[in-house]
Amino acid sequence: MKIDKQKEKEFMDSKFNFSYSSMNRLLFSPRIFYKEYILKEREVKMDKHLVEGRVIHTLLLQPDDFDSMFTVLPSKIPSDAVRRVLNDLKKYDNPNMSELDDEILEALQYHNLYQSFKDDSKRLAKIQTSENAQYFHFLLESKKDIIDQDTLDRCKNRVEMLKDNKDIMSLFTHEVTDFEMDNLEVYNEKMLDCNLVKYKFGLKGIVDRYVIDHETKTITIIDLKTSGKSITDFPETVDFYKYWLQAAIYIILVGKNVSEEIAQTYKISFKFVVIDKYDQTYAFNVSSNTLNQWTDNLHKLLEIVNFHYTECKYNLPYEFMVKEVTL
């Protein structure tokens, strides 16, 4: 494991707020967390399903921001594997891929792509295509996410399916007016952060949507998920990907970003809105008992996070560091 004491010091000297993804990464593999968040050697995630998820979120929750966040490519987007190679080539700042033979071959070897070919020229031919060249040009020139028209059309269709579900759209159609007695506060894609009394680190996250209803004294938090499985598998997915951890973090974030009176007296509810691989849509309610259990579990995990953070120990997951694990 590569160690850098100077970067460790810089990390500890700056206030770090854990997001769902960074906390999940630390719990899964402290070594990967160290590489990505302390050494800052984090690879940009360019997988197609992740990009499509962001497009759907934007079209539904922030449609006016779409043009500032995405560039639509006239031709087809390369595969995820090829895009990772092209992304590696960005650092050379050379738009002419024909002048990057050695760099392309090195990137292909690193990503173990087209290594079954015997001839380097065949490997290069797979990358140095007109379609890839066009994508690479956009990659160098644009700071936005790049999608193609097929992706945009597919995402628009999925958003329309969500809108066709009246039960789901009732969660996304609260209207706020300028009337000073308006009882609703609505927030979409809201970046929140907070300090934690017991710890030197804090929490942060972008909450898809939450609605504060001052008439009913309720706060409804809504998280939109695009799933590669069926909605029938979503309860297991919540455990597998620790979506419950994300929900618990969001509850704390929202609770700490409202007044103390609201935090103490308003009831918080949480809903997962899911569109699955078959374009089935459903809003999963989370019971109060389940939310309380998730929040309790988060507080237990914060002790583990605190151990790694304060002791600066990232060699192994917590349970392997504090006791012997027996099979």
Residue ranges and their predicted role:
Residues 60-65, 196, 211, 226-229, ...:
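Hydrophobic/aromatic-lined pockets within catalytic cores
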Residues 181, 185-244:
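Non-catalytic protein-protein interaction segments used by genome-maintenance enzymes to assemble
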